[in-house]
């Protein structure tokens, strides 16, 4: 009987720990109402041993606005106004327009824009490494192995780490972070440059 009680206490304490970590992470994400930052991104491909470094800037405004602009080594922009998602490749002069989806596997940083942060509990098992670092393990997603979110002591986003099932590792470090800034909604509408090849998937059946 003692063993059963001890096992129950152990399992219960683990569940409480997961719940506390999830609640802490949700509180931190909820406190990000708007944000601008520069980023440095490093992609390590374990299959080819190739590394790719890129940098740029991003901005978000809850509940639906998002912009991710890569300025080096190539010009790429991902912009969403909550209804449409524009993916622009400046080198190819190509723009793909999609309907917005909450595909965290494709864009892991969308977790920061989640309209219902309680969904984090449904999608991930969350553990806290310390007061400012959290590991998210997807419950169903087969593309992502884990996401690590690190905050600074004053609760600003410091970096994201994403590991995938394809043996790829991405680390995105943020700097010059500003939160609760006033950002115009119209800045999240994308206007294609002249002579851009446009593929509008929102018009497909």
Swiss-Prot record:
<dbReference type="InterPro" id="IPR029046">
    <property type="entry name" value="LolA/LolB/LppX"/>
</dbReference>
<keyword id="KW-0653">Protein transport</keyword>
<keyword id="KW-0143">Chaperone</keyword>
<dbReference type="GO" id="GO:0042953">
    <property type="term" value="P:lipoprotein transport"/>
</dbReference>
<protein>
    <recommendedName>
        <fullName>Outer-membrane lipoprotein carrier protein</fullName>
    </recommendedName>
</protein>
<dbReference type="Pfam" id="PF03548">
    <property type="entry name" value="LolA"/>
</dbReference>
<dbReference type="InterPro" id="IPR018323">
    <property type="entry name" value="OM_lipoprot_carrier_LolA_Pbac"/>
</dbReference>
<dbReference type="InterPro" id="IPR004564">
    <property type="entry name" value="OM_lipoprot_carrier_LolA-like"/>
</dbReference>
<keyword id="KW-0574">Periplasm</keyword>
<dbReference type="GO" id="GO:0044874">
    <property type="term" value="P:lipoprotein localization to outer membrane"/>
</dbReference>
<comment type="similarity">
    <text>Belongs to the LolA family.</text>
</comment>
<feature type="signal peptide">
    <location>
        <begin position="1"/>
        <end position="19"/>
    </location>
</feature>
<comment type="subunit">
    <text>Monomer.</text>
</comment>
<keyword id="KW-0732">Signal</keyword>
<dbReference type="GO" id="GO:0030288">
    <property type="term" value="C:outer membrane-bounded periplasmic space"/>
</dbReference>
<keyword id="KW-0813">Transport</keyword>
<comment type="function">
    <text>Participates in the translocation of lipoproteins from the inner membrane to the outer membrane. Only forms a complex with a lipoprotein if the residue after the N-terminal Cys is not an aspartate (The Asp acts as a targeting signal to indicate that the lipoprotein should stay in the inner membrane).</text>
</comment>
């Amino acid at each position: 009987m003692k063993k059963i009680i001890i096992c129950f206490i152990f399992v219960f304490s683990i569940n409480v720990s997961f719940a506390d970590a999830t609640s802490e992470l949700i509180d931190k994400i909820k406190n990000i109402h708007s944000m601008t930052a520069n980023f440095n991104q490093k992609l390590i491909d374990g299959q080819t041993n190739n590394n790719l470094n890129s940098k740029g800037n991003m901005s978000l405004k809850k509940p639906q606005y998002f912009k991710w602009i890569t300025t080096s080594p190539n010009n790429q922009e991902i912009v969403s106004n909550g209804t449409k998602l524009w993916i622009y490749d400046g080198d190819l002069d190509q723009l793909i327009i999609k309907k917005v989806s909450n595909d965290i596997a494709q864009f892991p940083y969308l977790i920061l824009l989640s309209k219902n942060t309680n969904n984090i509990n449904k999608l991930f098992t969350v553990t806290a490494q310390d007061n400012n670092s959290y590991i998210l393990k997807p419950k169903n997603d087969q593309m992502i192995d884990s996401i690590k979110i690190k905050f600074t002591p004053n609760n600003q986003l410091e970096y994201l780490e994403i590991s995938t099932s394809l043996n790829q590792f991405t680390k995105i470090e943020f700097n010059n972070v500003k939160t609760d800034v006033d950002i115009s909604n119209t800045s999240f509408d994308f206007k294609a440059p002249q002579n851009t090849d446009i593929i509008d998937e929102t018009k497909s059946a």
